């Protein structure tokens, strides 16, 4: 999107693995889903296999979407990438995946947007993200012009059947409860 810089120097290997969705702007393909995760693994063709998973509390079942992603530019001499990818879950149709904030030291959190300011996600390596970091990312998104007042804070509930959480982080005092 206009006036938003993507992160450069992405280490693709370090980016792989499971990410927990902390917050998102609403869109129909994730509506009503809790316990949302994105799992990234290397494909044989050099791309990334994307497995998105979320629990539909109304239907009481897990929904999965499997897709593929590719960096838009060739790697730099240090084998890192610009954080612009294309992602597809529906055949030849690709959407934008832009990494606009990242904990570059440890890859513990990331903020992603789509082709415009209607799509925004905050992801973490753990089911909870500390309040100061979450607040920093929301503030940054707000400065970029995203409608942060419309963010949905995802319920990462370990009581859902077949929920696989890695490390649990306790909610800090004063953190607002996720929308139900």
Write out the residue ranges for each language-model feature.
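A beta-rich soluble binding module of mature secreted/lumenal proteins
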Residues: 1-180
């Amino acid at each position: 999107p206009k006036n938003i810089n993507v992160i450069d120097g992405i280490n693709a290997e370090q980016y792989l693995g499971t990410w927990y969705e902390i917050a998102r702007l609403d869109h129909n393909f994730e509506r009503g889903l809790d316990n949302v995760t994105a799992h990234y693994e290397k494909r044989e063709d050099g791309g990334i296999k994307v497995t998105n998973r979320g629990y539909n509390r109304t239907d009481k079942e897990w929904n999965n979407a499997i897709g593929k992603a590719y960096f838009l530019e060739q790697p730099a001499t240090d084998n890192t990438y610009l954080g612009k990818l294309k992602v597809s879950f529906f055949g030849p149709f690709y959407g934008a995946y832009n990494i606009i904030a990242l904990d570059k030291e440890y890859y513990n959190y990331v903020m992603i947007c789509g082709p415009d300011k209607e799509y925004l996600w905050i992801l973490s390596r753990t089911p909870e993200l500390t309040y100061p970091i979450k607040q920093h990312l929301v503030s940054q998104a707000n400065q970029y012009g995203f409608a942060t007042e419309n963010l949905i804070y995802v319920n990462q509930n370990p009581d859902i059947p077949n929920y696989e959480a890695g490390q649990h982080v306790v909610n800090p005092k004063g953190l607002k409860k996720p929308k139900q």
